[in-house]
Amino acid sequence: MARYRCCRSQSRSRCYRQRQRSRRRKRQSCQTQRRAMRCCRRRSRMRRRRH
């Protein structure tokens, strides 16, 4: 069960896989890659609005 986490603004197209080992970092995780891509776009929009 590999979950995808929201990717950073630098690389929107790529979504990083989140391992179950890393419980320290709590980031928005998605079960599918499509959801992760959505997260990326959302985050980028949010950041653009802020700046």
UniProtKB/Swiss-Prot annotation:
Principal subcellular localisation of the protein: nucleus
InterPro entries in UniProt: Protamine_P1
Sequence ranges of Basic residues compositional bias: 17-28, 35-51
Location relative to the cell: Nucleus; Chromosome
Key words, A-Z: Chromosome, Developmental protein, Differentiation, Disulfide bond, DNA condensation, DNA-binding, Nucleosome core, Nucleus, Spermatogenesis
Annotated GO biological process: chromosome condensation; sperm DNA condensation
UniProt region (Disordered), positions on chain: 17-51
Tissue expr: Testis.
Molecular function GO terms recorded: DNA binding
Record-level GO cellular component terms: nucleosome; nucleus
Biological role: Protamines substitute for histones in the chromatin of sperm during the haploid phase of spermatogenesis. They compact sperm DNA into a highly condensed, stable and inactive complex.
Entry similarity comment: Belongs to the protamine P1 family.
This protein's name: Sperm protamine P1
Lineage start: Eukaryota, Metazoa, Chordata, Craniata, Vertebrata
